[in-house]
Structures are given as C-alpha cells and as structure tokens.
C-alpha cells in the first residue's frame, strides 16, 4: 500500500467528516473527490462505510450526555425521554424499509457525477424556497417534536438515498417544513443520524466483510480517524451557525458546485 493511497484515504476521511452533517451531501462529495484524486481501495464500499461510521461516532461523542440522559429517562419512565426516543425510531423506519428494497438499484444506477450534480442543484433550489417562506416554527426544541413531524422527516430522509441529495439536508429541511425551528431540525437530524447511519454501516459491513483484510486496514483506519476529528468540529460549528443564520449559503454552494460538475466532469 503506497503512501499516496494512504494520503488519499486521509483526505477522503476529512471530506466525509466535513460534509456528513452539512446540507451538501457527503456521499456526493466522496464520489466526486474519489474520481478527482483517482482513489483506489481494495475495500471499496467498506472504506466509505467505515469513514461514515467515524463521522457518526463523533456525534455520539458530542451528545453522549444527552444520550445517557435519554436512556436513563426511558427506563425510569420519563415521558419526554420516551416520546423523543419513539419519535427517532418512527423517523428511522421508513429509511430501513426503502433502503433494504432499493439499495442495489441505487448503488448500481444512481452513483454517478451526473446524478450528484442534478441532486445538488435541485437541493439548493429547495433550500432557497424553504428559507424564503414566512417561517414561524411551532416546535423550537428537538425533544418536543411530534410523532407526525417525526414521520414526515423520516419519509423525506429517504430522498437522501439519491447521491447528492444530503441526508442532513433532507432531514433539516424536512423538519423545517413540518414546523421545527432551524436549530431543532438540525439537532433532530443529528439524533436521527445515529440509528440510520449505524444501521446502514452494520448492514454494509456485513455485506462487504470479505474485503476487509490486513492489507487495507491502514487506509480504513486513517480515513476513520480524520472523519471522526473533522466531524467533531463541524457538528459544533453547525449548531452555532443555524442559531443565527439561514441555510442559503449552503444552497449557493450546492448550485455552484452542481453547475461546475456538469461543465467539468461531464
């Protein structure tokens, strides 16, 4: 395994952690940068899954106190903790069902620069539309989300299976459309990411376990570490950002990047 491939793994791990929780599509960026730097890994899909796991574990670490409080509250009979836990599970199940049914089609047909470019542009336009509304949220705390809102976010999250859409972008915008404040939607998106991404990672690792060997573990480990570290900074920064700013800057980024991809890579 060459030093160049190891450096590329570090770089892609950084990109994963940087983009996973921003509404700009981490999968889309991994596809694009993987093409640009000509990254080759024998572990293939397993590499992507493990670096995504690094990013989600960063969220688990940052929200560890809230997670512990929720678990303790759930088993001690705290109604708010139980309500929020069931809300997350309700939002999680649509992705499970649709993901299992459509995963092979999505990966074989939709993983291309053209799909990423189109999804980036459409997603950017949707963000502009949502942010242009007279936005008066009915729910300002993530733990107060209603079951109806949670289910709506869950179904909208399924759109993120299309590369370039962005799981965080879909869930944040879905939350805002259903009445959550920008911050509440962002924090609910983080909590929903935990079962969604951990479940997807487990499923994909089981399917790709045969390609995990001692020869490619260095690349995987390097990508995991950089994804974890960069995600730590991004999650904290995003929560502070959405408290005072709209998501329009991400909409501009998506549209410009999508146009560049169409002209340069296609």
Swiss-Prot record:
It comes from Acinetobacter baylyi (strain ATCC 33305 / BD413 / ADP1). Belongs to the UppP family. GO terms for molecular function: undecaprenyl-diphosphatase activity. This is Undecaprenyl-diphosphatase 3. One of its GO terms (cellular component) is plasma membrane. It is found in: Cell inner membrane. Its main location: membrane. Keywords: Antibiotic resistance, Cell inner membrane, Cell membrane, Cell shape, Cell wall biogenesis/degradation, Hydrolase, Membrane, Peptidoglycan synthesis, Transmembrane, Transmembrane helix. The keyword Membrane applies. Its EC number is 3.6.1.27.
């Amino acid at each position: 395994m060459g030093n160049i491939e190891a450096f590329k793994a570090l770089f892609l791990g950084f990109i994963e952690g940087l983009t996973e929780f921003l509404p700009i599509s981490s999968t889309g960026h991994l596809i694009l940068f993987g093409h640009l730097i000509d990254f080759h890994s024998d572990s293939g899909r397993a590499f992507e899954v493990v670096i995504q796991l690094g990013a989600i574990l960063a969220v688990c670490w940052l929200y560890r106190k809230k997670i512990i409080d929720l678990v303790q509250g759930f088993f001690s009979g705290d109604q708010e903790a139980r309500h929020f836990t069931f809300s997350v599970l309700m939002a999680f199940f649509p992705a499970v069902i649709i993901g299992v049914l459509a995963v092979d089609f999505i990966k074989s047909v939709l993983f291309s620069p053209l799909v990423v470019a189109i999804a980036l542009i459409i997603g950017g336009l949707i963000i502009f539309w949502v942010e242009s509304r007279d936005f008066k949220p009915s729910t300002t705390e993530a733990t107060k989300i209603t079951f109806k809102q949670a289910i709506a976010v869950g179904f909208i999250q399924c759109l993120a299976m299309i590369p370039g859409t962005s799981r965080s972008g879909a869930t944040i915008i879905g939350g805002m459309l259903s009445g959550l404040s920008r911050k509440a939607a962002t924090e609910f998106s983080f909590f929903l990411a935990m079962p969604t991404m951990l479940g997807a990672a487990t499923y994909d690792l089981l399917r790709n376990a045969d390609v995990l060997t001692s020869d490619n573990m260095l690349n995987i480990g390097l990508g995991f570490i950089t994804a974890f570290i960069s995600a730590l900074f991004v999650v904290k920064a995003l929560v502070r950002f959405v408290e005072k700013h709209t998501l329009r800057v991400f909409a501009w980024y998506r549209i410009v990047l999508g146009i560049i991809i169409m002209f340069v890579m296609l």
